[in-house]
Amino acid sequence: LACRSPALDLDGEFTPPETQHYPALPLEKLPELLSRTDNYSGRLLTRYALKLSLLFFVRSSELRFARWSEIDWQQKLWIIPEEREQIENVRFSHRGTKMKTQHIVPLSEQAMAILKQTEALSGHLAFIFPGEYDQDKCMSDNTINKALRVMGYDTRKEICSHGFRAMACSALSESGRWSKEAIEKQMSHQERNSVRAAYIHKAEYLEERIAMMQWWADYLDKNTERYVSPYQYAGYQREAS
């Protein structure tokens, strides 16, 4: 997963451990991606999964196996456990976070709205995104990528579901608004420096991450019609304030 911004002096500290590089669109293609997602004519739950996957930029299994019980509506948080309760006949449903520590995803107003729409369809079930043919199971691991292919993307060369993480990471970094610690924490990356890892593990940076996730959702909204760079958008906000 490549996540580097020339706008930042990272001093070798901003080093994601995920060495496999997944295809990701350049941020300039955001308006096209958002338009194609809005116009996706397949299953409605799949469209919601696409939208939330981009808003949350979590790993595929973290979203696929998500349960309604993990959503804290009052605090506007999605709390992903390090391990989930195994559901009978659902392979790997015990999987929680990849890093084996609880991960908090602050819910933007946009994410809350989509989750409410999703709840109307699957709120009576365990999984937020149930399978299309068996609602006791979760959506398949290929659902998002299949939808991207239907939307006209080559998931081997242009964009895959994991590529949303690189896009979000690039935008947050290039905006110049957020600390690398808060970005790393929200990306749920493993810090290689053991001393620094212990510090970051204790420091949640939650207040900054709440603001950051709302900024990301607002930034996506800003890009629905034409491309605005993260740095430009951050500048507009500074001028407005």
Model-derived features with residue positions:
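Short, basic (Lys/Arg/His-rich) helix/loop patches that form interaction surfaces
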Residues: 35-46, 105, 117-136, 142-185, ...
